[in-house]
Amino acid sequence: MNSVILMGRLTKDPEITEGKDDFIVARYTLAVDRPFKNRDGEREADFIRCQAFGKAAEFAETYLEKGMMIAIKGQIRTGSYENKSGDTVYTTDVNVEQHFFTGSSAKEDKKEETKRRSRR
């Protein structure tokens, strides 16, 4: 079984490309916080490359934007290609089947944090 569910923030707006027969692809990176802090007491994140096709890509194009907290369900895909130097580059991506809204945007989170601090 190849199934993955991730929750994180979009690092930038999805990049939309169009293929044959008006078939669109949405590509974006999801910053997923690790469940622990590093030695300096800071949270680190993994940056996961994601791609959505067809209806899932249309959803991403219409609704997703930088800073949004979302969850995704999909499958991990690995691949490889040869770069300009002739080296083999290995890739790991998530092929997104579904998107889920989970909360606010980064801007809204900052506003809420400012409100909490001003109440203290």
Predicted regions and their residues:
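Ser/Thr-centric signal marking residues that sit
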Residues: 11, 17, 78, 91-92
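Intrinsic-disorder/low-complexity, polar/charged segments enriched in Ser/Thr/Lys/Arg/Asp/Glu/Gln
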Residues: 3-5, 25, 47
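Acidic, gly/ser/pro-rich intrinsically disordered tails
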Residues: 1-2, 14-22, 37-43, 58, ...
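Short aromatic-glycine-enriched beta-strand elements
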Residues: 18-32, 90-91
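Short edge beta-strand segments in beta-sheet-rich domains
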Residues: 25, 45, 87-96
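Beta-rich strand-turn-strand
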Residues: 53-89
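OB-fold and OB-like beta-barrel modules that bind single-stranded nucleic acids
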Residues: 5-12, 30, 66-77, 96-99
